[in-house]
Amino acid sequence: MNTMTLTPGQLSLSQLYDVWRHPVQLRLDASAIDGINASVACVNDIVAEGRTAYGINTGFGLLAQTRIADEDLQNLQRSLVLSHAAGVGDPLDDAMVRLIMVLKINSLARGFSGIRLSVIEALIALVNAGVYPLIPAKGSVGASGDLAPLAHLSLTLLGEGKARWQGEWLPAQAALKKAGLEPVALAAKEGLALLNGTQASTAFALRGLFEAQELFASAVVCGALTTEAVLGSCRPFDARIHAARGQQGQIDVARLFRHLLTDTSAIAESHHHCHKVQDPYSLRCQPQVMGACLTQLRQTKEVLLAEANAVSDNPLVFAEAGEVISGGNFHAEPVAMAADNLALAIAEIGALSERRITLMMDKHMSQLPPFLVKNGGVNSGFMIAQVTAAALASENKALAHPHSVDSLPTSANQEDHVSMAPAAGRRLWEMAANTRGVIAVEWLAACQGIDLREGLTSSPLLEQARQTLRERVAHYTQDRFFAPDIECATTLLAQGALQRLVPDFM
């Protein structure tokens, strides 16, 4: 099991990916402890001195002007968690819950939240024991933070709600007991610190980014395979073309294609002196389109990595000055916009792949048998597989609609502009699945096209991509049940079968 020492505010993208993919044993770096304790001392001083501070001894949202008596402060925090656990929908899977918890721990341990070390350690214990709170997928608008999802997370700390332990849903009390853990009682400010924050939104978008990276790499490999299958030219990937424009994403994508499409390709050599002047845009403009997508991925990474290491609580405790200041770091607009931009990239990756599939279907454009099968008429070949790809690509056009431009006021207009970041991030998962299906069809089609080149081989890396598929999916000599082949290719893509052929591009 992966062991990770958490230095608050310094999580890397690779660490976040590992948290998403695998269970982790988490340890808090000792350097965080003084800051955590100082923020708690500041909160305690405010309570002891009778000063009024939002979230410490007041109500919440529109009820912020209501002063809460000292004897009710513990009950205030517990009531907050219980009342805000109002999410709906299917439970998030363990990987997403684990990522949300680690993001929450990272934020709280920065020392601006006024939450005791013992509560942070209780969250770490949940992660390490594999106790995963039941968090419904829906119910947050991404301001004031992800209140409902984080309330469901916090329920388990209190011994309320349900949690999954070793694959079994249990009452939270029972799950804690089996894991050898105890519920906690929350002190002043702690319930609000747990609930306020953008951790669910950020986790949703991070998953979208992780999947988009795999899709991008897979699409570049399949685009290179298709270029070979239809006897496309390598000249559009010449470094001089892309240097003249100066778009870094485009320059880097062209380099990836040159890495894949080498001079050792017998296919490329076979038509080196052919009469064709230019290829269709879906081949020739791959660096331009995929380069723009890569730029979006990189910008999304920058925003999400900053947010993953951010303090998005409210109010914030500035212990050195002895102040608690209300602000709006819980507003997930940066995450929503990043997710919207990522949606455009995922949609375009799939759209370009679908165009290349269609190109291979047309015998006049591809110089291959219609629908990539011999004895056409008796055999339909890839005819309907292309239709499936078109359906998936078209779905993504609707799903790419921006969420960050939407807003509905909540909390009796106290929270009158919200980000819709959770929905912006969550739809990326469906879009990624659609695009993966499109790329799977292209992989199948491109390998079939190369097979039909009568023994000619491609470059070593592309032959490796073809061999990986052919170990699981046979060449089509005649029609057969097609869906299992798409499913097989999709699974291989999700496992990174093609991604590992591409050098790091982020």
UniProtKB/Swiss-Prot annotation:
The modification 2,3-didehydroalanine (Ser) is found at residue 144. There is a cross-link at residues 143-145 (5-imidazolinone (Ala-Gly)). Gene3D superfamilies: Fumarase/aspartase (Central domain), Fumarase/aspartase (N-terminal domain). GO terms for cellular component: cytoplasm. Belongs to the PAL/histidase family. It catalyses: L-histidine = trans-urocanate + NH4(+). It is found in: Cytoplasm. Pathway: Amino-acid degradation; L-histidine degradation into L-glutamate; N-formimidoyl-L-glutamate from L-histidine: step 1/3. It comes from the Bacteria. The gene is hutH. Pfam families: Lyase_aromatic. GO terms for molecular function: histidine ammonia-lyase activity. Transmembrane segments: none annotated. One of its GO terms (biological process) is L-histidine catabolic process to glutamate and formate. Its EC number is 4.3.1.3. Keywords: Cytoplasm, Histidine metabolism, Lyase. This is Histidine ammonia-lyase. Contains an active site 4-methylidene-imidazol-5-one (MIO), which is formed autocatalytically by cyclization and dehydration of residues Ala-Ser-Gly.
